[in-house]
């Protein structure tokens, strides 16, 4: 069974540069055997809420930005 990962990122951080690398990041995790769920933050404390939501549903949580 494939492992699941949620990747939470702030699209406004770093002048939005992560958007250009997002597919490369996902590819790295896919090659590591992870199914990747991508979530962009929309408001203050959104990353915290996303972590709470996925804490029991995925094998790994990665946050950026």
Predicted features along the sequence, with ranges:
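ATP/NTP phosphate-donor binding region
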Residues: 1-64
């Amino acid at each position: 069974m494939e492992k699941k990962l949620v990747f939470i990122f702030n699209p406004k951080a770093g002048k939005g540069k992560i958007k250009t690398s997002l597919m490369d990041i996902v590819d790295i995790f896919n090659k590591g055997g992870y199914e990747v769920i991508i979530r962009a933050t929309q408001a203050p404390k959104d990353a915290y809420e996303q972590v709470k939501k996925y804490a029991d549903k995925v094998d790994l949580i990665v946050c950026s930005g």
